[in-house]
Amino acid sequence: MVLNSTPPASPGAEAQQRPPRYPGEDTAPTSRKEIWGWYAYGIAAEVFAVCGVGSFLPLTLEQLARERGTLLSSHLPCVGSSSPSTAPGNGTTTATLRRDGTDNDQCVVSVLGLQVNTASFAMYTFSLAVLVQALTLISFSALADYENNRKTLLLAFGFIGSMTSMLFIFIAPPVYILGSLLVVIGVTCLGSSFVVLNSFLPVLVANDPSIQTAHKEEGEELSPVNSSGEFARSEDLDEENVRDSDDHFTTGHGLKTKAAGSASPELQLSTRISSKGVGLGYCAAVLVQILSILMLFALSKTSLPKISGTLPMRFVLLLVGIWWFSFTMVSRRWLRDRPGPPLASSKGAASNSRWRIWLRLIGFAWKSLWKTVKVAVKLREVIVFLIAWFLLSDAMATVSGTAILFARTELKMSTTAVGLLSITATLSGMAGAFLWPVVSRRLRLKSNHTIMLCIALFEVIPLYGMLAYIPLFKKWGVIGLQQPWEIFPLGIVHGLVSGGLSSYCRSFFGLLIPPGSEAAFYALYAATDKGSSFIGPAIVGMLIDATGQVRSGFFFIAVLILLPIPLIWMVNAEKGRQDGLAMADILEKSHGEHASEYGGPSEEAEGLLARDI
């Protein structure tokens, strides 16, 4: 197996290396350059997440379909000289759209023989993309932990995803369906690459010289998991049998850290690196979003919008793709391979043996997730919270997609204005991550009470949009998201609430997990998140098709946001913690009963999905 040839961080670094736990493991001390290689991918991909998925991809998809669509009643083109009216907007041309709901004519496009509203087309596309992403994450979670697959998959997802963004420059309205396919591939690559990227973090931390020094000072041995230097696979979970670790759980990299509750050096370093990575990613996204707005403004002064209303946005997606590709190249150069254990195969086996092993790993990933579900069902507080998280994560994803399309179609906002809205929400989200701990501390709120407060504020968004159905406000032409400026305060609310919900839900769930089973249960947490987020957009898309208005989706969203509140209130954190500890005792008793099937590390066998947190 060929290892990365990056030199050690210092001349004496080799002396600080911990013993390898399997043939071919790279235990070279983590260098500053390698950490920046890890940061570089976050800087690369977060731009696509915010500027692409969160802003311009929904707009581009809707506009591509619109330029190919016809009005439902007259069958006239939605866009063009023969359409009843047009409204320019910084490089795009928009057909007749309602702001007050009085015009029931809608722009539809034929998809698989069905007449679909152009806004619904975008919602359905993202719903499908999230579903494919969830299936991909679960299926490839185990495979990525072996040999050089970790870095190989990271680069593959990064390069393929960036190419999908760049290829939008060639997607003209006649082939708008191909744009939908590119979105599915791009979103899948984005989510999958972040999961693989997160899997590098424990490896970087475990090999950091400061961690090894700290363990030596504490007299802790940097030893393999077992005496043979092999890893134990995660245990099979059944009605009586649940995996657990000892009082110290293994990080999956040969280091033993204290159980949850103590601030280990690994946890402190991991948190510090992760926080900086998130911050750098968001800063890069805001920077590129500003550049995109300037580009749209400049291109609106040219003849490009006359050729196609989507061309300026497609140039923005080209910029986003180039950015993603370029910084992925930096990660390719600076990140070491850090290979996992070799795939077990029989001597002299045919080449197709490797494919059989890969298929077994994919099956194992699904089997492992299902067994974790069966264990979670026995923990009442865990299952109640996961149901609430299922609904809440779906609501968050649905609001984001609906808001962008509502701003574009119902409010007739220009592409530049939508970009500014995205920047507003992103900056507010960064502020919310810091603000909510202060609010919680000042008001002396429990974690679940803070989550409920966030949800209550989140409910303001759809309720405010529904005010436009009240005749008095409808007559005024203001209040209830009837004017473009009204959506910006709600964008601030959305950002602040999303920042709080993401951090508090994750930490609150951590209180309920049996100590030592963090990887398996966070895999279930991530699968619940990814697996639910395709439902809401699909339902909103159907409502848009039925009514011809994006605003009608607010009724469903309002109910969806409210449903988790009683469930969160029902969760007893202290009881959940005690149940988790009791389950941990069962885990400890069953630890080591089953032999390793693949020869992979215990945590890594849980799958990379556990690290998408």
Curated annotation (Swiss-Prot):
The keyword Ribonucleoprotein does not apply. It is a multi-pass membrane protein. It holds the Pfam family ATG22. Residues 80-96 have a biased composition (Polar residues). The chain crosses the membrane at residues 41-61, 120-140, 155-177, 189-209, 278-298, 307-327, 382-402, 418-438, 453-473, 488-510, 522-544, 553-573. Belongs to the ATG22 family. Its main location: membrane. This is Autophagy-related protein 22-2. Residues 1-28, 80-99, 216-257, 592-613 are annotated as: Disordered. GO terms for cellular component: vacuolar membrane. It is found in: Vacuole membrane. Glycans are attached at residues 90, 226, 448. Residues 232-250 have a biased composition (Basic and acidic residues). The keyword Transmembrane applies. It comes from Neosartorya fischeri (strain ATCC 1020 / DSM 3700 / CBS 544.65 / FGSC A1164 / JCM 1740 / NRRL 181 / WB 181) (Aspergillus fischerianus).
